[in-house]
């Protein structure tokens, strides 16, 4: 019996999501230590102290189920961003929410629009529900919003937009998004995936929650894995109009957010100093990456995220493999249709130094531009 024959039709064409290589795996494979992982856009400052203290206070209560509605976390999010608790949906990471949006608003033969070179989970969730994927060719490695509008049809149910985009780091301004949303029919749900929004400079950051007042079909999705440092706990949230939030919470699994994730998220919601420290390091070190690439004539895509994508003008897999032997893990993105690129997470200064040294050795970079 081949069980693929009884699987959902959409599942048959899927391949499992390939995460960045874990440090422990490379240690086992090559027997090396002092490895630097710059592959998964994780927080280089580690787990925030505010969350550690909150977890310690929660440990004696783990025999109880978590708060299924996440009342205290919703209250903290609402207070921080000036929204209402009934606008909020909590997820087991923002990936959980992306799947939830697809299950709630699209079905078999409905159309889902997203960009070429956008987050790979968008096509995964689209195919899993047997919906029709409409991948719009990228414009300068980012979203072609006019192309999105042209692709709209009576069958379009859902649009995914990552801002900043992963894995390219492209960024859409608030004016661009506002003009786009004004042209999208209200019956089409637009998901604005802001997993990396904290890394944008405050002066240019999109006030996405204000857009919710103008566009009732908008959902803003955010993650606590990146700037907030809670990747291992899996927690994210979405903000939408209350009617959409109600529908999402009908589909959302009960207890999808565990107690430690909830209590940690509540703590970091008020830990502005930690998030600013992370963002400032990212801005400073991003400039070093850009200067390095310019110095050695390496093309890169300007990024507003906590990563930079470099175009090596040749298949990048051998470069990736050699970097592994130097104890540096980065992210190959051939699965995104970008076989000549590698995505590098912005780390601490010493981690970035190790990458620069390793890449110069791997590419034999001697002649500065």
Specify the residue positions occupied by each region the protein language model found.
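N-terminal "arm"/small-domain region of PLP-dependent enzymes with the aminotransferase-like
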Residues: 1-64
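Phosphate-binding glycine-rich loop
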Residues: 63-111
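PLP-dependent aminotransferase-like
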Residues: 104-161
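PLP-dependent enzyme catalytic core of the Aspartate aminotransferase-like
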Residues: 322-326, 331, 335-369
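Short acidic capping loops at alpha-helix termini that bridge into adjacent secondary structure
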Residues: 34, 84-88, 108-111, 155, ...
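PLP-dependent aminotransferase class I/II
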Residues: 69, 217-301
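Conserved PLP-binding catalytic core of the aspartate aminotransferase-like
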Residues: 282, 292-326
